[in-house]
Amino acid sequence: MRLIIVSGRSGSGKSTALDVLEDSGFYCIDNLPAGLLPQLAENALINTELLQPKVAVSIDARNLPSHLMRFPELLEEARARHIQCDVLYLDADEEVLLKRFSETRRRHPLTNANRSLAEAIRVESDLLGPIADLADLKIDTTNLNLYQLRDSIKLRLLNQPEPGTAFLVESFGFKRGMPVDADLVFDVRCLPNPYWKPELREHSGLDQPVIDYLAAQPDVEDMYNDISSYLLKWLPRFAASNRAYVTIAIGCTGGHHRSVYITERLGRQLQQTLKNVQVRHRDL
């Protein structure tokens, strides 16, 4: 049996995550009391005909604070039943969460007469801290629309053809912010920028004219070789430490040229030596 626990601050996309999982064949339970996690795992093993082999539950700040504080031991009890448990934690910048609530006019579950929306979001962050600390996978939804979030969940959580650590090599642009869910970040803004070549500006790092330009730059080759050597040496150590997910982020200014080119090359090389390597371009 596989159990996916979905959590995160309100407005970060938990409902969307559950919808994706349900569409993928998971039996989904919204707002499960955290204290029932061990019982859910136990009942799933005893009554296999009652539950599907894939179950997803959401746990949020509407739980009793005492149950949320006990989440580490509750998760350990569930895993002691020899069930594969993955914790997915969704989050976004506070300003983005405020904007989402303003646009939808929904009420935050922790607001009241004495607590503003901004205060409720900060309180929620504290309450969910024990879950966030144990997340196997964190997804920052700040810059993701509904469709991008759905694709990200499918790519990172469901598209694992073989067991073991899932590696994601992701390009991004610093002008839209660093991905907060990245484990390793490499800044390639010091490399020659095709943006300043008028004939290359409208192309991306996936297009042959940009590829040819960057491949001819000695600094680009040196940077690629240094990053590649580091990753080839150390990523197997991450896998050996039983990490479920590792995200490698490559950033340039806009996320269209240099980071895309480097990310594509790294992805192809890592796929030759590691299992479960995926490539994503956040800002294309």
Curated annotation (Swiss-Prot):
This entry's Gene Ontology molecular function terms read: ATP binding; GTP binding
What keywords are annotated for this sequence in UniProt? ATP-binding, GTP-binding, Nucleotide-binding
Q: What is this protein called?
A: Nucleotide-binding protein PP_0949
Q: Cystine bridges: which residues? A: none
Annotated residues that bind GTP are located at: D60, A61, R62, N63
Family membership, please give it: Belongs to the RapZ-like family.
- Which parts of the chain span the membrane according to its record? none
**Residues given in the record as ATP binding sites:** G8, R9, S10, G11, S12, G13, K14, S15
User: So what does this one do?
Assistant: Displays ATPase and GTPase activities.
